[in-house]
Amino acid sequence: MAEEHRCETPEGHRLCVNNCGFFGSSATMNLCSNCYGDLCLKQQQQASMKSTVESSLSPVIAPVLENYAAELEIPTTKKTEEKKPIQIPTEQPSPPQRPNRCTVCRKRVGLTGFMCRCGTTFCGSHRYPEVHGCTFDFKSAGREEIAKANPLVIAAKLQKI
């Protein structure tokens, strides 16, 4: 008699397969809404992981397969490559150091020295050409620069009619 009065669920309602205490439906594989949502989420994560693994492996595997196929297609005839000798970098000579003393007074100038157009280094008081007796011809150099900057233009003669 106790068996007759036992609490049974109606035929349309079934408990969740995961035994969580909620009712499941046949549309959700007899899972409740919470368990079905968790199942869908796990399936999506597995699918995304599978696609990322396949995409990361495909670039690595494809060239290996192509190289292997290329080796099989080509018979044993291979070109021998000439080996180029390895060049050892030699130390390049350092640029010539600027003289760090004035040519006239031998005073140490360092970075404040002035290079004259005659090619020597001078201190602040001997930097002018008149003071150190420069041999450079500034007038002819100026004339040459002006001639290069302003070439002579000669127009073609017009014929008289």
UniProtKB/Swiss-Prot annotation:
Which residues are involved in binding Zn(2+) 2?
C102, C105, C123, H126
Location of region: Disordered: 76-99
Compositional bias segments (type: Basic and acidic residues)? 76-85
**So where does Zn(2+) 1 get bound?**
C16, C20, C32, C35
Keywords attached to this entry: Metal-binding, Zinc, Zinc-finger
Q: Which Gene3D superfamilies match?
A: 1.20.5.4770, AN1-like Zinc finger
- Zn finger limits (AN1-type): 96-142
The entry's Zn(2+) 3-binding residues are: C116, C118, H132, C134
Q: Does the keyword Metal-binding apply?
A: yes
A Gene Ontology MF term for this entry? zinc ion binding
Q: What positions belong to coiled-coil segments?
A: none
SMART domains tied to this protein: ZnF_A20, ZnF_AN1
Annotated A20-type zinc fingers sit at 10-44
Q: Explain the purpose of this protein.
A: May be involved in environmental stress response.
The family database entries (PANTHER family) matched by this protein are listed as: AN1-TYPE ZINC FINGER PROTEIN (PTHR10634), AN1-TYPE ZINC FINGER PROTEIN 3 (PTHR10634:SF67)
Identification of the protein by name: Zinc finger A20 and AN1 domain-containing stress-associated protein 4
Species source reads Arabidopsis thaliana
Gene name per UniProt: SAP4
